[in-house]
């Protein structure tokens, strides 16, 4: 007998929302795609949803509540913008207090969630924030070092193809850096975090690449490397295109020639450099859009576990 599936809606019919819809319909064990919500009647995402037999509305979150299927919806994925999510959460919560929102914007009303690091702690949350694409790719690496040694500082540089960044991503650049930096600390375990995003205009488009620099107490390098490799394998389980681009690199910062970290002061210890590449599954945009893929894959992995927990309960 097939397991019960819970109904889900997606707000935001752009690149992220459309990719997520395809993932749910092809791969979800516990969720059923029930509605696609947008604000542009001519958007490709709404057109695709309609062709696939999914209920659609171009009247935003208000339109969603007017759809006959709304009463049966348990999960809503929000792939709009940080500002819009705050309003969407309040509007939906007033009508259905128990509804689960998976926030794919940098709004961060609810706790940050990076599935491989802290999902178990948030299975009962009504609103979880998926940080950012850069956060989903890099925070696991910071956490991997954190479980071996105290991390004083972590800096990530996320480089994504300009073609993969839609208007929503571009409008949220400031929020991207702020939210990712905070989550590096809150989830990754760093005392201080910093995030940088680069939109690469290269043609042909390049795959998502991320660089992670971690400054920690001195530790056994083999243990740190093993922790990083194990964490990368865990992410790969739900993001098949996720991989370490090259071997982990280590540098020892001697006490007599310390680094000066703004806002942190002088540092000596172990510098760990991790280089990641994320190839997209090409469900909607081509394979270069790994940033899209890791965000939607993480969101789906989170909702799947939550739905499984609800069904079993």
Curated annotation (Swiss-Prot):
Domain of life: Bacteria
SUPFAM superfamilies linked to this entry: Glyceraldehyde-3-phosphate dehydrogenase-like, C-terminal domain, NAD(P)-binding Rossmann-fold domains
Biological processes per GO annotation: catabolic process
EC number: 1.2.1.10
Keywords assigned: Aromatic hydrocarbons catabolism, NAD, Oxidoreductase
GO-annotated molecular function: acetaldehyde dehydrogenase (acetylating) activity; NAD binding
CDD domains: ALDH_C
Keyword Iron-sulfur attached: no
Principal EC category: oxidoreductase
Active site: 133 (acyl-thioester intermediate)
Residue numbers binding NAD(+): 13-16, 164-172, 291
Catalytic activity: acetaldehyde + NAD(+) + CoA = acetyl-CoA + NADH + H(+)
Similarity remark: Belongs to the acetaldehyde dehydrogenase family.
Official protein name in the record: Acetaldehyde dehydrogenase 3
